[in-house]
Amino acid sequence: MAEETQHNKLAAAKKKLKEYWQKNRPRVPAGVNRNRKTNGSIPETATSGGCQPPGDSATGFHREGPTSSATLKDLESPCQERAVVLDSTSVKISRLKNTIKSLKQQKKQVEHQLEEEKKANNERQKAERELEVQIQTLIIQKEELNTDLYHMERSLRYFEEESKDLAVRLQHSLQCKGELESALSAVIATEKKKANQLSSCSKAHTEWELEQSLQDQALLKAQLTQLKESFQQLQLERDECAEHIEGERARWHQRMSKMSQEICTLKKEKQQDMRRVEELERSLSKLKNQMAEPLPPEPPAVPSEVELQHLRKELERVAGELQSQVKNNQHISLLNRRQEERIREQEERLRKQEERLQEQHEKLRQLAKPQSVFEELNNENKSTLQLEQQVKELQEKLGEEHLEAASQQNQQLTAQLSLMALPGEGHGGEHLDSEGEEAPQPMPSVPEDLESREAMSSFMDHLKEKADLSELVKKQELRFIQYWQERCHQKIHHLLSEPGGRAKDAALGGGHHQAGAQGGDEGEAAGAAADGIAAYSNYNNGHRKFLAAAHNSADEPGPGAPAPQELGAADKHGDLREVTLTSSAQGEAREDPLLDKPTAQPIVQDHQEHPGLGSNCCVPLFCWAWLPRRRR
């Protein structure tokens, strides 16, 4: 803005000078130069243009008069001075312009620096924000780490306490080990004797069981033939009854069609009679109206007596026809009622016959059920024989590995000690202890250097290898026993719960002989069912004895020497009860030689007081509570 104002002032000054010189050049007075020469002074130049003010020039112009050539020369010198002044001012102006340009450049540089500083400040603010976010995340992570450290410290304390408890338990188990080894020496002698006895008895039991199974199969075949014959007879009777019923149905349909036709004809006749009655009533009403009309004033012709008699006869005839029609209607209504009653009776007879047919069909189905039941039982017998063969093969394999029954008992007790010793290494011991409680298995003898980890790992590998075969045997036996008991009880319960209660009476009275006296095919079927029940009960008892002998010879220490853990576990589990199958087994269980010995009693008490010290739930295989299930 300052430069523009200066330029404008310069331009205005130049214009004024030009105008001034154009006006005052020929009229310059001479006295002015003289005065200037005498005085020797130069008139002051104005800052705006360096020229004299117009008032002085005007006064000089009016004072002096006409100009001359001398005065023109005198005037040229101040003009030159003024031109020099103008040149100096232009130089100054150019310098000022250069300074202004340099200032503008400096201003641009300063603005550029300010922008760069603003960008740097923004970047610094962003970096500060990111640093604040990182600081917050680090604080949160620090808090999480502190909580994790707190939980870790708690878990470490808990693990330390558990390790102390496990160390105490290990010490106690090592103390019990010596006592158990002393008790084992007493058990070995008794187990050897029992193993020898059971090995000799197992063959006799197998042969006897095979004979029983063959006899049962023969009985079942005979019963199946009888049932097939009775079933064929019942089918023939059913066909005859069906034919008879179909013939009766055809007859009744014919009769019903005839009766319906008769009813239709009677209805038509009734309608015709009703129409006739209506016509007669109309004619009577007309005659009555004619009789009631007044006589005309003219003397009417007197009807003759013949006409009167004729009219009376017609009235009598019409009255007789009406009475006959009424009687016919009453007779037709009675016939209709009788026909309706007959139809109802016929419908009731048909309904009763249908009910009888349904009862016969149900009886046939019930008689056909025992045949399917016995077929299923035959298939079950075959499957049980196959399972027995598999069990024998597995027992032979185990017999090759475990030569003596005493070593088996030793292996069980030492395995419990090993399962108690394992928790000292970590939490894996608790898992192994729980597995041992679920499925106790015979284990080999424990090595003496249990404290070394290498010996423990090799020992556990050996235990796993030995446990696989025993697990297979246990699973097969459990599967066989559960399957046999459930199926047998289902079939026997089904046979006992037949309608009429005759199967139960026949089972209690003696099969065919007493059921036959009750009459008919139902007695024969009930007697056959009772014979099947008796045969299967004998077979079931023999099969239990055989499996008990085989199981005791292979895995169990004997019916007379149950483990202390088994005695405690049978009370804890409600669905597992120690139920002996024969009275001899009960006597042996009561006369337990281990419980009478003073060395075994403290061991049993120790296991009862300390259930965590390897007290595995060793329940015998034949202790399933199947009798309460059957009572339910």
Swiss-Prot record:
Residue ranges the record marks as coiled coil: 85-150, 209-421
One of the Pfam families matching this protein, by short name: GOLGA2L5
Similarity comment text for this entry: Belongs to the GOLGA8 family.
Residue ranges with Gly residues bias: 508-520
Membrane-crossing segments per the record: none
Region (Disordered): 1-76, 423-445, 505-524, 552-573
Keyword flag Flavoprotein: no
Bias (Polar residues) ranges: 38-50
Superkingdom of origin: Eukaryota
Gene Ontology BP term (one): Golgi organization
Species classification: Eukaryota, Metazoa, Chordata, Craniata, Vertebrata
UniProt xrefs under PANTHER family: GOLGIN SUBFAMILY A MEMBER 8H-RELATED, GOLGIN SUBFAMILY A MEMBER-RELATED
UniProt key word Transmembrane: no
Protein name: Golgin subfamily A member 8N
Annotated Gene Ontology cellular component terms: cis-Golgi network; Golgi cis cisterna; Golgi cisterna membrane
Alphabetic keyword roster: Coiled coil
